[in-house]
From Swiss-Prot:
An MF annotation (GO) of this entry: ATP hydrolysis activity
Xref: Gene3D superfamilies: GroEL (3.50.7.10), GroEL-like equatorial domain (1.10.560.10), TCP-1-like chaperonin intermediate domain (3.30.260.10)
Encoding gene, per UniProt annotation: CCT3
A Pfam cross-reference name: Cpn60_TCP1
Disordered: region residues: 527-555
Keyword list, A-Z: ATP-binding, Chaperone, Cytoplasm, Nucleotide-binding
One cellular-component annotation, GO: plastid
UniProt-recorded name of the protein: T-complex protein 1 subunit gamma
Assembly, per entry: Heterooligomeric complex of about 850 to 900 kDa that forms two stacked rings, 12 to 16 nm in diameter. Interacts with CCT8.
Chief localisation class: cytoplasm
Source organism (scientific name): Arabidopsis thaliana
Classification of source organism: Eukaryota, Viridiplantae, Streptophyta, Embryophyta, Tracheophyta
């Protein structure tokens, strides 16, 4: 007998075959079960304690999973799913996990019957293509200029969130903000950059009803010399700079030998003249407000206040970009390059207000702002954080609608229609792929079933009634009213989903399920390469062949 050959080192742990499939599916199901109860308007909240002892109370799928620390690699990739969904379309983070978990769950039976994973994946991909075709068939277009329709959609998105009691207000805020920053690219395309140009400023205190969308920008800064500079300017001329207004330090150290006392004064005078020069270049454009991202010396401050110009220093780059978009200014890198066209004249009002203990600067009433700020008020920090998460989702939905103005029914109606259509289609599929295809069709029912569970109605009775209504492929708009658990027409109840979100949910869930099914080996315990400077490494002995050519000394 030959001695067994060890290929992998002892420290490596290797699992393969059915054990891996089973482990992956169990891990994915566990993740899906954690957030299953947060789907729909009657969803539960989760309270998470982080390492620092802070508390997060939320029902946003992505926010919950982000806080979790999981060990299993498959569970990690499931969590990555909701993050992708959040970045792509901003909503549907819970649905995508529930759907992917269900897809894997129904695949388990086939793996036990020794179906090859590739066969299951092929059937799943076919089911995905057909489900997107069904979406295209039942989608209806809306007019994005009709505010009431867009409002209905955004409201049905927020209806599932913690702040649903303030649905109208958040929906209004989201639509106002996204329509403000929308830019027409021509050919019917619109670009809406939520991350860059919409800032959410959270200020605890006051009532939630005090929240508003500012047609402009606000930031947590005061003018440099509050006593001497104006804190309120109507129709200000604004100059934005990206350079320091203080004496430039030398790049490398220089020594100057001072022989007489006057030499010292000459040096100081040079510094003063340098700053005065910069200020004169700026002041000849008669600005009312100068904002710089870098420092501003006391001397420059003196010249500005003497000329009646307000100044703000050390502003964040992102805020500066927003101000530029809002008032039409151009950020300038050197004062001597300033032109009349760089000055922002689009703002109607600059003022500094005290909210709570902090001073905030407002540049508002802009004529055609392409950036805006959502000011959120509320009783506590936790409350405002949750409102912000919901607002981000609502803005994403509004953005999706502006980009692709198509709706599909909500309340699980879309999934039931897809499921019914795929079941009918599975009869025409030949060969072994028929069964996994049919299973995928059944898996789509996980969403309406979860909705019914969270409402507390009789799940079996409700699902049977719904399946009966959808079996003939008609009335695609029949679904569950998430608040009452009753079966209703989604068109009448105005429960809608964005086409983009649904399509992305299906694609992400099924592709992820296929990816996890294809994994048949998990090797753990692979050594990390030591990072530079992270600790003593063993001395390496170079032979002459290894040594770099430069290190070989000439004979």
């Amino acid at each position: 007998m030959h001695a067994p050959v060890l290929v992998l080192s002892d420290s490596l742990k290797r699992e393969s075959g059915s054990k891996v499939h089973h482990g992956n599916i169990q891990a994915s199901k566990a993740v899906a079960d954690i957030i299953r109860t947060t789907l729909g308007p009657r969803s539960m909240l989760k309270m998470l304690l982080d390492a620092g002892g802070g508390i997060v109370v939320t029902n946003d799928g992505n926010a919950i999973l982000r806080e979790l620390d999981v060990a299993h690699p498959a569970a990690k990739s499931m969590i990555e799913l909701s993050r992708t969904q959040d970045e792509e379309v901003g909503d549907g983070t819970t649905s995508v996990i529930v759907l992917a978990g269900e897809m894997l769950h129904v695949a388990e039976a086939f793996l036990e019957k020794n179906y090859h994973p590739t066969v299951i994946c092929r059937a799943y991909i076919k089911a995905l293509e057909d489900s997107i075709a069904v979406l295209d068939k039942i989608a209806m277009s809306i007019d994005i200029n009709d505010r009431s329709q867009v409002l209905g959609l955004v409201k049905s998105c927020i209806g599932t969130k913690f702040t649903s009691q303030f649905g109208d207000l958040i929906a209004d805020l989201a639509i106002d903000a996204t329509t403000t920053v929308g830019v027409d690219l021509g050919q019917g395309l619109r670009e809406v950059d939520i991350k860059k140009y919409i800032k959410v400023e959270k200020v605890p205190g006051g009532q939630f009803e005090d929240s508003e969308v500012l047609k402009g920008v606000m930031f947590n800064k005061d003018v440099v010399a509050p006593g001497k500079m104006k804190r309120k300017i109507v129709n200000p001329r604004i100059i934005l700079l990206d350079c320091p207004l203080e004496y430039k330090k030398g790049e490398n150290q220089t020594n100057a030998e001072l022989v007489r006392e006057e030499d010292w004064e000459v040096l100081l005078k040079l510094e003063e003249e340098y700053i005065e020069n910069i200020c004169v270049q700026i002041l000849k454009f008669k600005p009312d407000l100068v904002i710089t991202e870098k420092g501003l010396s006391d001397l420059a401050c003196h010249y500005f206040s003497k000329a009646g110009v307000s100044a703000i220093r050390r502003l964040r780059k992102t805020d500066n970009n927003r101000i530029a978009k809002a008032c039409g200014a151009v950020i300038v890198n050197r004062p001597d390059e300033l032109q009349e066209s760089d000055i922002g004249t689009g703002a109607g009002l600059f003022e500094v207000k005290k909210i709570g203990d902090d001073f905030f600067s407002f540049i508002v009433d802009c004529k055609e702002p392409k950036a805006c700020t959502v000011l959120l008020r509320g009783p506590s920090k936790d409350f405002i954080n949750e409102v912000e998460r919901n607002l981000q989702d609502a803005m994403s939905v509004a953005r999706n609608i502006i980009k692709n103005p198509k709706l599909v029914p909500g309340g699980g109606a879309t999934e039931l229609t897809v499921s019914a259509t795929l079941k009918q289609k599975s009869a025409t599929i030949e060969g072994i792929e028929k069964w996994p295809y049919e299973a995928a069709a059944i898996a789509f029912e996980a969403i309406p079933r979860t909705l019914a569970q969270n409402c507390g109605v009789n799940v079996i009775r409700t699902m049977t009634a719904l399946q009966g209504k959808h079996a003939n492929g008609e009335n695609a708009w029949t679904g569950i009213d998430g608040n009452t658990g009753a079966i209703a027409d989604m068109k009448e109840s105005k429960i809608w989903d964005s086409y983009n979100v649904k399509a992305q949910t299906f694609k992400t869930a099924i592709e992820a399920a296929c990816m996890l099914l294809r994994i048949d080996d998990i090797v753990s315990g692979i050594k990390k390469k030591q990072a530079p400077g992270s600790g003593p490494s063993k001395p390496t002995i170079e032979t002459e062949g290894d040594a770099d050519n430069e290190q070989i000394l000439p004979d």
